[in-house]
Amino acid sequence: MMPQSGVAQPPMAPMSMDQHQYQQQAPPPTQQQQWMMPPQQPQQPQFQPQSQPAWAQQPSQQQYGAMATTNPNPSPTGNPNEVRSLWIGDLQYWMDENYLSTCFYHTGELVSAKVIRNKQTGQSEGYGFLEFRSHAAAETILQTYNGTLMPNVEQNFRMNWASLGAGERRDDSAEHTIFVGDLAADVTDYILQETFKSVYSSVRGAKVVTDRITGRSKGYGFVKFADESEQLRAMTEMNGVLCSTRPMRIGPAANKKPVGTPQKATYQNPQATQGESDPNNTTIFVGGLDPTVAEEHLRQVFSPYGELVHVKIVAGKRCGFVQFGTRASAEQALSSLNGTQLGGQSIRLSWGRSPSSKQTDQTQWGGSGGAYYGYGQGYEAYGYAPPAQDPNMYYGNYPGYANYQQPQQ
């Protein structure tokens, strides 16, 4: 008899029609066999294993609804004050409550699933919450599923406690992250992670940035390390190394500082909204520059992200501009470098003025530059939820952070 406690393992895949017919047509036991066999209780149909378990197959919309109604949610048990909810992120636009229910249906521990949606558009914000029967069940689910492959999609579960209570420990240590560009279309989180983990033991995870609507890779991602020395080694040792079919392009990325590190306030660049909405804009404003940083140093830092058209530091203003050849390159640089340290100062990035703007660009490239002393909010290149709704996880909008300093050459 199977034990009732704990989390159930994923169910076996349904048997084929031929197998089902074979079992139905099997001859009944002889009279002697009937006497020797103990009385049996009604049993659930026995499933035969196959290469892909049933929980890893994409259900249809009808199956989603049927699954949700045929498995009544169990009632919570234990202390009502204990933490029983998990946060789940990196959800694609089509991943709704029914999809999440199918992921954990077989455990018998899921009470409810909720996807957070934009109040104006109704579209998913890319994260949600899962409530389980008990704290113990939620903890087992977290330990079992976090970082493993999600059903029928090439990405891993990204989970954490929805809130921290007694007994939970959060990772307050710093994380050291690198940017990885020029990724082939078939590179997944797992492939990227294993490419680095086979060389560096401190690799904590990897994330390939995907389009929220299509789910397709944008061709770049991030790898995080626990050991800063391995991060710095990877910056040079892995540059040009093949991942799948293409050589990787490695660059610096903003790091997560330990919890408790004071974060700087953010200000809104009045030009950022206009620049972000213009698909032809490839110019990035760079604020907070150390006076010792020269244009050549700025070029070295931004060049790993794509072809540079123009680099300009406004004299005496501690700010500058970097123009890329393509919008995609500018997006990668902005999302990766915002908050990194150059010359001992954390740079602040936002979109510069669009070249198509009818306004004069004298202040942008050679004038006072006064309009650009502010800088925009964290650029949500990944489509993740804001940091306040993402409890101590990595990637996306982690603000501040940055211990990597590009070496002078």
From Swiss-Prot:
Tissue expression from the record: Constitutively expressed in leaves, roots, and stems.
Domain RRM: 84-164, 176-255, 282-354
GO process terms (BP): mRNA processing
MF terms in GO: mRNA binding; poly(A) binding
CDD domains: RRM1_SECp43_like, RRM2_SECp43_like
SUPFAM superfamilies: RNA-binding domain, RBD
Primary localization: nucleus
Keyword terms, alphabetized: mRNA processing, Nucleus, Repeat, RNA-binding
UniProt-annotated location(s): Nucleus
Residue ranges, compositional bias (Polar residues): 263-280
Pfam family, one: RRM_1
GO CC aspect terms: cytosol; nucleus
The organism's place on the tree of life at top rank: Eukaryota
Coiled coil feature spans: none
Record-linked PANTHER family: POLYADENYLATE-BINDING PROTEIN RBP45-LIKE ISOFORM X1, TRNA SELENOCYSTEINE 1-ASSOCIATED PROTEIN 1-RELATED-RELATED
Assembly notes: Interacts with the poly(A) tail of mRNA in nucleus.
Protein name, as recorded: Polyadenylate-binding protein RBP45
